[in-house]
């Protein structure tokens, strides 16, 4: 190990120790067993480390470096070992993913087929997470606060969850006393996962419906009447999957989507809209009969160093 790598390893380990001490009691107070420990805190170690129960999920963000491919693989393994040793997690419970810039297909890239799944807990609820097979685990930790806010508004509401992924917002809504939930995602894999998450928390019955569909097409095909009172729209930045009608780009498609949703929301109804697209620009004047308020400062959790991990708006139907 050269001197530079040793220094990077030591700085990474020191930061992990400090964060682990700082967050020692925090998860219990917040009723969570999955949270962010490290987020590129040391610039030369551009990794993200999340804890799920007694496991670690580590991701690398692409960044230029002067190592050969083999040298970089060796460097990554040293950093992964450092995290395991520092946080006293067995190496077999540490999962590493390379997170490349999105260049095609879906945001939810498949990287394996091992099927290593565990239960994670958040806000008194249980979620199935897959640590081995996808770049993402099935639970977006940066929306923990948003989910809690959504639950707080769900009592007796007819809830619509578009681009639902594994259905965590539907689970929170059902727990908040929603009259009904409608969960929509084009991926059958994630739709089945959403159903499993609902069942795990005891939410079954005809009032909870699931649809495998392109979200925009699904809404357009609904009658133009107030079918819902509360909605969440958390789309990918883009997608060009063959299973959806057309390429999706959030910046150019959000206006028609939100206007279509608004036409099916009751007066005074609420839409939560979020995006991870860093350069996204919201044009409030293009939205029909909607009062728009950005709430990103309230929705990004305190364990996230990157306060721009997402942007979020609470939109009210006039």
PLM features per residue range, with description:
Residues 186-230:
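S-adenosyl-L-methionine
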Residues 190, 212-216, 229-260:
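Mobile active-site "lid"/loop adjacent to the S-adenosyl-L-methionine
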Residues 1-55, 61-62:
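Non-catalytic accessory regions of SAM-dependent methyltransferases
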Residues 180-185:
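Conserved SAM-binding motif I beta-strand of class I
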């Amino acid at each position: 190990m050269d001197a530079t790598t040793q220094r990077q390893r030591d700085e990474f380990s020191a930061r992990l120790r400090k964060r682990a001490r700082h967050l020692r009691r925090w998860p219990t107070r917040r009723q969570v067993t999955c949270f962010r420990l490290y987020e590129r805190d040391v610039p030369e170690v551009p990794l993200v480390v999340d804890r799920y129960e007694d496991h670690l999920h580590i991701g690398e963000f692409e960044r230029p470096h002067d190592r050969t491919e083999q040298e970089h693989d060796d460097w990554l393994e040293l950093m992964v070992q450092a995290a395991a040793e520092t946080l006293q997690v067995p190496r077999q419970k540490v999962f590493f993913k390379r997170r490349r810039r999105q260049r095609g297909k879906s945001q939810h890239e498949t990287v394996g087929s091992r099927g290593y799944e565990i239960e994670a807990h958040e806000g008194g609820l249980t979620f199935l997470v897959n640590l081995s097979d996808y770049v993402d685990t099935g639970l977006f930790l940066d929306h923990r606060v948003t989910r809690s806010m959504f639950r707080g508004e769900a009592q007796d509401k007819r809830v619509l969850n578009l681009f639902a992924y594994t259905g965590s917002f539907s689970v929170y809504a059902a727990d908040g006393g929603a009259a009904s939930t409608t969960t929509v995602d084009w991926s059958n894999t994630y739709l089945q996962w959403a159903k499993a998450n609902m069942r795990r928390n005891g939410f079954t019955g005809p009032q909870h419906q699931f649809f495998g569909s392109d979200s925009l097409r699904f809404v357009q095909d609904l009658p133009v009447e107030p079918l819902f009172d509360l909605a969440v729209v958390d789309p990918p930045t883009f997608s060009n999957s063959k299973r959806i009608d057309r390429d999706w780009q959030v910046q150019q498609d959000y206006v028609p989507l939100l206007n279509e949703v608004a036409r099916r929301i009751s007066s005074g109804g609420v839409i939560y809209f979020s995006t991870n697209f860093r350069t996204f620009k919201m044009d409030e004047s293009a939205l029909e009969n909607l009062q728009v308020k950005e709430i990103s400062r309230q929705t990004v959790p305190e364990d996230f160093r990157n306060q721009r991990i997402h942007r979020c708006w609470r939109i009210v139907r006039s």
